């Protein structure tokens, strides 16, 4: 059952980066998976180019982050050694602040250096005729990105884990046919065999530390 799978594999791999659980899952699924390399299928595709963009937090954002670090240290000191979820929650909050402080503070009236940098990348790419897949782990971040794309007049679709399968298929078809320039996708929803051949740029807004999940 799914609960057993979550306990044995999904939670240890996704939340705890358990290499042993990942190895066991690979052993179980290996005989049923045929992996084809890009070079074996489409030889005319250019090689993948990866660019890492490091963004400095603005002053307000940095102050909020440092305050969260102080709070995190206090919580971790009080946590029990076996309480892995406490560590995970602390790291997650720091990641959210880096993405956009509004993910943790509803009354935030400052900006987000990362969001601004992402929008610069997206608008420049769209103006250059590119199509983009934009991934985030946080659905609330996708909502903020969608709002900014609307303000910038950039056409886009959004796919989340709650999106029904028939709707997913229709969104994929419409994106591949050129009806939108950007496809916003939650990281977990993206791992469902989507065939998005129209995009030539992929942006991971908040890269996940577990490469297998990403």
Language model features with spans:
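AAA+ P-loop ATPase catalytic core
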Residues: 25, 32, 36, 68, ...
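Conserved SF2 helicase motif VI
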Residues: 211-214
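A short linear boundary/processing microfeature
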Residues: 8-11, 71, 151
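Conserved P-loop NTPase motor "coupling/switch" region that bridges the ATPase
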Residues: 1-40
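Short, polar/flexible loop-turn hinges at active-site or ligand-entry regions and domain interfaces
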Residues: 12-19, 73-81, 105
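Conserved Helicase C-terminal RecA-like lobe
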Residues: 43-67, 79-194, 198
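Short conserved active-site loop signatures built around small residues
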Residues: 202
């Amino acid at each position: 059952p799914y609960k057993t799978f979550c306990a044995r594999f999904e939670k240890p791999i996704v939340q705890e980066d358990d290499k042993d659980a990942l190895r066991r899952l690979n052993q179980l699924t290996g005989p049923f998976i045929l992996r084809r390399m890009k070079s074996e299928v489409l030889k005319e595709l250019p090689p993948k180019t990866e660019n890492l963009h490091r963004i400095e937090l603005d002053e307000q954002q940095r102050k909020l982050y440092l305050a969260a670090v102080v709070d995190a240290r206090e919580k971790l000191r009080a946590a029990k050694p076996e309480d892995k979820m406490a560590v995970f929650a602390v790291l997650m909050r720091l990641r959210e602040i880096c993405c956009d402080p509004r993910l943790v503070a509803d009354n935030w009236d400052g900006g987000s250096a990362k969001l601004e940098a992402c929008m610069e990348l997206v608008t420049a790419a769209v103006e250059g005729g590119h199509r983009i897949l934009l991934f985030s782990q946080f659905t609330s971040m996708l909502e903020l990105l969608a709002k900014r794309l609307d303000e910038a007049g950039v056409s886009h679709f959004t796919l989340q884990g709650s999106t029904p399968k028939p709707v997913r298929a229709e969104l994929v078809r419409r994106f591949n046919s050129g009806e939108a320039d950007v496809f916003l996708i939650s990281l977990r929803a993206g791992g469902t065999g989507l065939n998005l051949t129209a995009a030539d740029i992929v942006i991971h807004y908040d890269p996940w530390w577990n490469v297998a999940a990403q």
